[in-house]
Amino acid sequence: MRSPLVLLDGASMWFRSFFGVPSSITAPDGRPVNAVRGFIDSMAVVITQQRPNRLAVCLDLDWRPQFRVDLIPSYKAHRVAEPEPNGQPDVEEVPDELTPQVDMIMELLDAFGIAMAGAPGFEADDVLGTLATRERRDPVIVVSGDRDLLQVVADDPVPVRVLYLGRGLAKATLFGPAEVAERYGLPAHRAGAAYAELALLRGDPSDGLPGVPGVGEKTAATLLARHGSLDQIMAAADDRKTTMAKGLRTKLLAASAYIKAADRVVRVATDAPVTLSTPTDRFPLVAADPERTAELATRFGVESSIARLQKALDTLPG
């Protein structure tokens, strides 16, 4: 089997590192570096386990894209730190001690020569979805703690799998179409697309998406298993001769405007204008700028984490 292209959900991983690694981990100058250490260590573990020859850390260049807010104004509204004047992009509420650590992580990635991928006006989910969908050569492994990305699983044209970090990296679960279909009771031949439709119907309070009132995950899965797709569900709801329960038909039809809007909000983009910070996503076996990498590692007090990353790289074929 070919070595995979690994796509890391940057924000998902450094948020989990921030909350999962003790804040007592500090740099020599006293600044917290728990997220930095956790992120680098997690990357080393993923490299050791998956043995990629290509890798990109995918970034939110816009964590709350306007096209999604225009469709559903409540989208991530509860995460806005303070409304910005004059149409400026909203700022996400982030722990004060995490923000500077994100800059540290990006400095280290840049010094090491590890590709960072982003697209103006799009979230990391869209970047991941675009890169996974357009890959035609290598199998793809998406690493994230965001269930929304289960919609990108595929078998063709290349295998796309999601390493879901819901319970942490040590207990991560690898999902492909078969696993998504089995776990959620969805049609196996379109498990990824069906998962997006399940999420749309169920809703997601963490993203400010209400879902269809009275339709939970179990009901949504049953509808998709029975009818095959969201379009067919809505066609059945609109058909007076359908066997669908009258109460359920009423709920779906009452929510038809929401369903139409949420369809574009929930599905990840697969055509985002993604660019890389490096000429290639080929994974460097040694730091591109070893002096700067060493200086940053010393300044941030993460020499041991960088050493573990290099040890993981040393196991990869040249």
Swiss-Prot record:
Keywords: DNA-binding, Exonuclease, Hydrolase, Nuclease. The lineage of its organism: Bacteria, Bacillati, Actinomycetota, Actinomycetes, Mycobacteriales. Its EC number is 3.1.11.-. InterPro entries: 5-3_exonucl_a-hlix_arch_N, 5-3_exonuclease, 5-3_exonuclease_C_sf, DNA_polI_H3TH, FEN, HhH2, PIN-like_dom_sf. 5'-3' exonuclease acting preferentially on double-stranded DNA. Signal peptide: none annotated. It comes from Mycobacterium tuberculosis (strain ATCC 25618 / H37Rv). This is 5'-3' exonuclease. PANTHER family: 5'-3' EXONUCLEASE FAMILY PROTEIN, FLAP ENDONUCLEASE XNI. GO terms for molecular function: 5'-3' exonuclease activity; 5'-flap endonuclease activity; DNA binding. GO terms for biological process: DNA replication, Okazaki fragment processing. Residues 194-278 form the 5'-3' exonuclease domain. It is an enzyme of class 3 (hydrolase). GO terms for cellular component: peptidoglycan-based cell wall.
